[in-house]
């Protein structure tokens, strides 16, 4: 990455993260002025994001859709573009930026990690057991995520209602 692209990219990430934070605070405390500031952070972040993609396009000579970083950054850019158009035309959807900005920060963070360029598998990994292992490991992570989500929901309801009802009888 060129210096201009790097500065623009990380400025966008920081602004999206600030936007996400303001969205969360605005939604939690039901303050539309805070949510409006979040939209401003998101819009400025979008300008920096556009600059980063433009510099990348100029530097490489092709649209930023080929490498992993480029394709994820472009997908995030389109997501923010869609959100900005939506919240401009339908202000009632302004708070949906909490999901957009949060996801975009995660995607851009993921895209900026070391190379995900695919290569040939080594002979020791060319086995049906790799597929079986990856399937079960991924399924286990999914189960842990579901369990964590149910646990958070259970704790939230228990602490705020003091009655769980029949649907939350959890075996322990």
Regions of interest found by a model, annotated:
Residues 1-172:
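Polytopic transmembrane helical bundles with strong interfacial aromatic enrichment
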């Amino acid at each position: 990455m060129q210096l201009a692209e790097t500065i623009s990219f990380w400025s966008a990430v920081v602004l999206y993260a600030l936007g996400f934070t303001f969205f969360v605070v605005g939604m939690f405390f039901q303050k539309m002025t805070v949510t409006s500031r979040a939209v401003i952070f998101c819009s400025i972040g979008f300008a920096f994001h556009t600059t980063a993609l433009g510099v990348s396009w100029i530097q490489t000579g092709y649209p930023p859709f080929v490498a992993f970083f480029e394709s994820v950054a472009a997908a995030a850019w389109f997501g923010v573009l869609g959100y900005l158009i939506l919240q401009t035309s339908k202000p009632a959807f302004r708070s949906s930026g909490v999901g957009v900005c949060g996801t975009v920060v995660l995607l851009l963070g993921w895209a900026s990690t070391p190379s995900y360029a695919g290569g040939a598998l080594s002979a020791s990994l060319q086995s049906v057991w790799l597929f079986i292992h990856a399937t079960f490991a991924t399924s286990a992570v999914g189960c842990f995520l579901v369990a964590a989500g149910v646990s958070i929901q259970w704790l939230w309801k228990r602490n705020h209602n003091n009655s769980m009802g029949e649907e939350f009888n959890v075996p322990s």
